[in-house]
């Protein structure tokens, strides 16, 4: 066993000496190529020294094998002299790989320099454009949220103050139509110096305000002439019940005087005439009034059923005066 170990140590020294000699001779390729047989003999001896210790499983042998393996890696040029050993091929590959690494490292360094130069050329554009555009947005968003009693609360924007000219123009357009198309809204906003959002919000508020007043019956047409009229769908029921309801008191009057019926008709017709006089300013009211006139035109169909009652009132109160036919004419 000791003899085998001594032979291994001797072989290790010989391989180290040959590796160092071939490392110095590696810079001269022709001489290295000429020394190929010597390299082959050295590689064969190293192979024999490597294969022998693998057969014995003792610790010193494995340590010697590991040391010879690392010495071959530390001196990769020693294996480059001979191509018979597998370690020689690996040593040459590692040597060329290290050379490629050096080349790629230099190329990478130049590429990095070019990239940084290109990045610095675009740096002024990025720093001047994007942060400037983002900062006002943050400034606009920050004041909208305020912490009140430990809870975030959104602060409302200040109310838009319209001038008298803008209000008059908006009111005139609202009298024409309560809903604006997109081109009309853009044109109106541009002419008044407002944004489209402001015009849209004004029309929405105006419509909601009018609907509330219309439902509650608080439409002061005489006190507030600027108040807009009702929607077209709601205008016919206003005039139609006026004509139909005034006929009911006459039928319910029975033996009442005809002059009283005439008074009721005249008093009932005065609010409708005032409303029609005010609503006549709106173009869409004429369409509604046309439908109302159609309803009034169908009303005379009820004359045959009511004529006996009217004649009865006429004969019964003939001594009081012939006011009943006049009242019937005013109602219908």
Curated annotation (Swiss-Prot):
Q: By its UniProt entry, which Gene3D superfamilies does this protein fall under?
A: Homeodomain-like
Q: Which residues carry this modification: Phosphoserine?
A: 235
Sorted alphabetically, which keywords does the UniProt record give? Activator, Developmental protein, Differentiation, DNA-binding, Homeobox, Nucleus, Phosphoprotein, Transcription, Transcription regulation
Protein name (record)? Homeobox protein DLX-2
The entry sums up its family as follows: Belongs to the distal-less homeobox family.
Stretches with biased composition (Gly residues): 253-266
Q: Name one Pfam family in it.
A: Homeodomain
Q: What Gene Ontology terms for biological process does this UniProt record contain?
A: branching morphogenesis of a nerve; cartilage development; cerebral cortex GABAergic interneuron differentiation; cerebral cortex GABAergic interneuron fate commitment; embryonic cranial skeleton morphogenesis; embryonic skeletal system development; forebrain neuron differentiation; GABAergic neuron differentiation
InterPro entries tied to this protein: Distal-less_Homeobox_TF, Distal-less_N, HD, HD_metazoa, Homeobox_CS, Homeodomain-like_sf, HTH_motif
Cite the record's Basic residues compositional bias ranges.
Answer: 310-320
Entries under SUPFAM superfamilies matching the protein: Homeodomain-like (SSF46689)
- Subunit details: Interacts (via homeobox DNA-binding domain) with POU4F2; this interaction enhances retinal ganglion cell (RGC) differentiation.
Give the subcellular location: Nucleus
Instruction: Please list the residue ranges that the record marks as compositionally biased, kind Polar residues.
Output: 19-28, 55-75
Keyword DNA-binding among UniProt keywords: yes
Gene label: Dlx2
The Swiss-Prot or TrEMBL record annotates one GO molecular function as: DNA-binding transcription activator activity, RNA polymerase II-specific
Q: How is it modified after translation?
A: Phosphorylated by serine/threonine kinases.
Residue intervals passing through the bilayer? none
Q: Which residues bind DNA?
A: 155-214
- Name the segments for region: Disordered: 19-83, 219-272, 304-332
Recorded GO CC terms: nucleus
- Which tissues express it? Expressed only in neural and other ectodermal structures of the head: the brain, the vomeronasal organ, and the preameloblasts of the teeth. Primarily expressed in the germinal cells of the ventral forebrain in the midgestational embryo, and in both dorsal and ventral ventricular zones in late embryogenesis and early postnatal life. Expressed in the inner nuclear layer of the retina.
Query: Its domain of life?
Result: Eukaryota
Q: Composition bias, kind Low complexity: at what positions?
A: 40-49
What's this chain's function? Acts as a transcriptional activator. Activates transcription of CGA/alpha-GSU, via binding to the downstream activin regulatory element (DARE) in the gene promoter. Plays a role in terminal differentiation of interneurons, such as amacrine and bipolar cells in the developing retina. Likely to play a regulatory role in the development of the ventral forebrain. May play a role in craniofacial patterning and morphogenesis.
